[in-house]
């Protein structure tokens, strides 16, 4: 059974990842990164006490006691303010690339939110937003394997947006940049060494989501 300290540490880590890492989190709560690492790093040596828990909640504009509870849904009753721009945060789930292909149709019915890995999205997003971990190297150097991309299916894609597309012939999802040139539209791989960097859109695919934010976990390892 998880202890209160386990729950607090897990929630703090999600907030940390949502704002871009330990340094940003430390700035948010007006502490040194070395101090925050001691209570939520991989080798944490301290627990998050009551006063620190309440301090973190206050800095993120969260209800008192939020850090003490496990959160099994994608919604936070009171969305935290994590920047001076007052952007809202919603917890969203990490899903597979296969699930992404049918997400608009099945959505959360395909994900057990009680066990799903969820993270706060630092920018305003729709209720259907999800997270994918980048695989492959077609979008290097801007995106690397293991990077987390937050995808909102409800945001219309425009020229220059990075998008998730469903290929009709294979049923597979792909991650590329949308290029519009006059009346023509293309999917572009950002890797300059990619053998076929452009895919012409001619009814062969559907754009099913727009990337609205990305993050780079520093300790994530690709599973073999």
Swiss-Prot record:
InterPro entries per UniProt: LexA-like, LexA/Signal_pep-like_sf, LexA_repressor, Peptidase_S24_S26A/B/C
Q: Which UniProt keywords apply?
A: DNA-binding, Repressor, Transcription, Transcription regulation
Q: Which Pfam family, an example, fits this chain?
A: Peptidase_S24
Q: GO biological process: any one?
A: negative regulation of DNA-templated transcription
The entry lists its GO molecular-function terms as: DNA-binding transcription repressor activity; sequence-specific DNA binding
Disulphide bridges: none
Q: What is this protein called?
A: Prophage repressor CohE
What is the source species?
A: Escherichia coli (strain K12)
Taxonomic lineage of this organism?
Bacteria, Pseudomonadati, Pseudomonadota, Gammaproteobacteria, Enterobacterales
């Amino acid at each position: 059974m998880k202890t209160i300290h386990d729950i607090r540490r897990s929630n703090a880590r999600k907030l940390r990842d949502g704002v871009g890492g330990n340094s940003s989190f430390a700035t948010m709560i007006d502490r040194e990164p070395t101090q925050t690492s001691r209570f939520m790093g991989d080798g944490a040596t301290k627990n998050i006490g009551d006063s620190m828990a309440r301090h973190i909640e206050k800095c993120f504009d969260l209800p008192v006691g939020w850090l003490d509870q496990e959160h099994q849904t994608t919604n936070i009753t009171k969305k935290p303010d994590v920047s001076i721009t007052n952007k809202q945060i919603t917890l969203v789930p990490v899903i597979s690339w296969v699930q992404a292909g049918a997400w608009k149709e099945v959505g959360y019915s395909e994900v057990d939110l009680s066990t799903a890995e969820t993270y706060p999205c630092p920018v305003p997003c729709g209720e259907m937003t999800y997270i994918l971990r980048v695989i492959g190297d077609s979008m290097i150097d801007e995106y690397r394997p293991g990077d987390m991309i937050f995808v909102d299916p409800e945001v219309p894609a425009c020229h220059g947006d990075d998008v998730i597309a469903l290929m009709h012939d294979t049923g597979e999802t792909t991650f590329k940049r949308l290029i519009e040139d006059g009346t023509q539209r293309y999917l572009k791989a950002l890797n300059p060494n990619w053998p076929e960097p452009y895919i012409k859109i001619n009814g062969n695919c559907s754009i099913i989501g727009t990337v609205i934010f990305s993050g780079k976990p520093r300790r994530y390892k690709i599973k073999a």
